[in-house]
């Protein structure tokens, strides 16, 4: 098809209900064989939350929801049911025993201690964070088996008794420089032991630059650009591609200065592959209590009271599925569904509507520009078994599990060696790099171009 170069947000504000709760909105999910030097045999999972964070998002910036359960799930045997889950629960605290820092205001004899309105009152570094007025901590729980009924084990850092999250990047007056902030954030990488696992795992939670690339505004304005490569090859800069076509430029990336909050876990592959064939499926979810009652006299510690069963409100495995495949009336249903129940969404995969929508938008313009009489720009191979393989079953010999249960998740073959960062192809398997998407997903994989070529 001629129309192949659109860029879409992977899962930013993808369903009506989740737009009302950005703190539990999963934006992207990654699973890959670790390629950092010295980390052979490890698998990294990254779940990004809270989309479209502005660098100037003060004074409160972007804290995680203390009422939520954030989870990374792993299916090691292909039955579409989690075998291992890592669950994050956050606690937000103010300095001075949760009262907040107060400063003496006024002259002697008429002085009052008054609380400050900011999250810090001075510089912060890896060596000294005493000026911080706000902090986030989190517990990490491993659930073996079903998320609801499985065995729960509280995990703790090898040093200390609580995991902590760095403050968001406030600016250079607070952190001196981006390099110093990086050093500060690195001090929040923790090692922890997994029961029955010989080697240590690692975890990090903190604000990162959003690695996804998207022309967000124009894309959802009915693709308000020519969605075909305008150069002879991406980045060539010669203008010898499709007449008037879009070219590769940072000017087209509406997420260039946006951040997300990453929940990252790196574990030995042998600890999550179980008795399967080395291929694992994974996804992330966020859940909230069913009921919330607002406190009419809200305080920092108790703005509301929540109760009832934890209810899944966000879900993300493979990129683009809920964003571009699921119909708008079923997006919230997908967000709350379990992979084992994905049969209800089969028609969206076997007979997707997006290609036909693009055909309606661009067929006449393409024929006019090229002087052709193309009958349709959309694929005609129905049912779309190619999409079923890409999103629901995995590719035989690459990332298909021994037991095949059609379900949407990100599948990774842990037996395929990681490709060093400098040698990776952004096109993953399509670029002869078997360690990339759709065999898992790395932050640098160009999932849009890959998916639109399936």
Give the role of each language-model region.
Residues 8-454:
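Surface-exposed extracytoplasmic segments
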């Amino acid at each position: 098809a001629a129309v192949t170069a659109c860029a879409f947000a992977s899962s930013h504000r993808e369903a009506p209900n989740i737009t009302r709760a950005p703190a539990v909105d999963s934006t992207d999910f990654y699973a890959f064989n670790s390629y950092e030097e010295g980390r052979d045999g490890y698998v990294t999972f990254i779940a990004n939350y809270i989309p479209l964070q502005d660098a100037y998002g003060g004074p409160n910036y972007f804290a995680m929801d203390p009422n939520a359960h954030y989870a990374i799930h792993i299916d090691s045997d292909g039955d579409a049911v989690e075998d291992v889950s890592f669950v994050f629960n956050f606690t937000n605290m103010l300095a001075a025993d949760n009262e907040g820092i107060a400063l003496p205001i006024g002259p002697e004899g008429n002085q009052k201690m008054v609380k400050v309105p900011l999250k810090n009152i001075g510089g912060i570094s890896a060596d000294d964070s005493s000026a911080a007025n706000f902090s986030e901590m989190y517990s990490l729980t491993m659930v073996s088996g079903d998320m609801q009924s499985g065995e729960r084990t509280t995990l703790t850092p090898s040093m200390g008794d609580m995991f902590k999250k760095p403050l968001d990047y406030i600016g250079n007056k607070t952190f001196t420089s981006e390099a110093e902030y990086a050093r500060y954030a690195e001090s929040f990488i923790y090692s922890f032991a997994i029961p029955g696992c010989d080697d240590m795992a690692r975890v990090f939670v903190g604000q990162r630059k959003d690695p996804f690339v998207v022309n967000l505004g124009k894309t959802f304005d009915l693709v308000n650009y020519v969605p075909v490569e305008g150069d002879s090859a991406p980045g060539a800069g010669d203008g010898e591609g499709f007449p008037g076509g879009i070219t590769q430029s940072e000017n087209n990336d509406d997420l260039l200065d946006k951040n997300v909050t990453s929940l990252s876990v790196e574990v030995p592959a042998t600890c999550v592959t179980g008795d399967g064939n080395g291929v694992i499926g994974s996804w992330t979810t966020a859940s909230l209590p069913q009921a919330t009652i607002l406190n009419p006299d809200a305080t920092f510690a108790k703005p509301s009271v929540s109760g009832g069963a934890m209810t899944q409100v966000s879900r993300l495995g493979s990129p683009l599925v809920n964003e571009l495949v699921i119909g708008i009336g079923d997006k919230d249903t997908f967000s709350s569904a379990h992979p084992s129940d994905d049969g209800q969404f089969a028609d969206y995969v076997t007979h997707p509507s997006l290609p036909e929508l693009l055909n309606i938008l661009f067929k006449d313009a393409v024929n006019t520009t090229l002087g052709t009489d193309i009958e349709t720009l959309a694929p005609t191979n129905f049912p779309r078994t190619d999409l079923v393989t890409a999103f629901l079953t995995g590719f035989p010999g690459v990332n298909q599990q021994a037991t095949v249960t059609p379900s949407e998740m990100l599948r990774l073959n842990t037996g395929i060696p990681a490709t060093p960062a400098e040698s990776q192809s952004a096109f993953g398997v399509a670029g002869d790099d078997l360690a990339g998407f759709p065999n898992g997903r790395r932050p640098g994989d160009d999932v849009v171009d890959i998916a639109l070529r399936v």
